[in-house]
Amino acid sequence: MYDKLPLELWVKITNYSQEFGLLLTNKNFFELLYLMKFETNIIEYVVENNLLDILRHIIFLKNINHPIIMENIIDIRCLEESLNASCKNGKLEIVKLLVDLGANIFHNENCAMMLASEYGHIEIVEYLVSKGSDVRADNDYAVIYASKNGHLEIVKYLVSQGCDVRSCDSYAVRLASEYGHLEIVKFLVKKGANYRALNHHAVIEASKNKHYEIVEFLMNYSTGITK
């Protein structure tokens, strides 16, 4: 039914409704993007709606140098914003497809990898690091905020990849103490984090927030008693 409508009518309907979905009912309609005037970028639309098959089709068109891709779809800023959002939201397959499409994983000091670390998506972190992301970008932001948010597996992985647990006056262990992540505190201290940094900030914040197991661990560690 839909493919029997004249192309001119499709153009008018789609421009009026601003609905990308109308172009996704048939691969042949995709080329109508030449004639469309959308306010929203199609990559953004596809990512927000988790349309993996459409992304794969766009990659296919890119690989055969289809002119519609170069002229109408690829917007570097939008690619990077979509990559960051997908890393934050844990959408590994979309992250991979966006990288295949040309998204820059190093943009804004490796922001994509830092967001994946901060929000606890270990598989995305590992994937981005395998692609060359710098785990120490922005003064070890990734391990610091993974520590703050209690992502022990990510903290261990990042340290294994070279993150400095003493960066920014051992900020990682101070945040882990403040937010009550005992196992991360133990791990970081045993890896060399300075739990006495900034006049014992870690134990003070742990005490202030009633994380008494952390207080006990840090006090015992300072006297040579470990459990």
UniProtKB/Swiss-Prot annotation:
* ANK repeat locations: 38-66, 78-107, 108-137, 139-167, 168-197, 199-227
KW Repeat (keyword) present: yes
Matches recorded under InterPro entries? Ankyrin_rpt (IPR002110), Ankyrin_rpt-contain_sf (IPR036770)
Keywords per UniProt = ANK repeat, Repeat
SMART domains the record matches: ANK
Stretches of the chain forming a coiled coil according to its record: none
Asked if the keyword Nuclease belongs to this entry, the reply reads no
The protein, known as: Putative ankyrin repeat protein L45
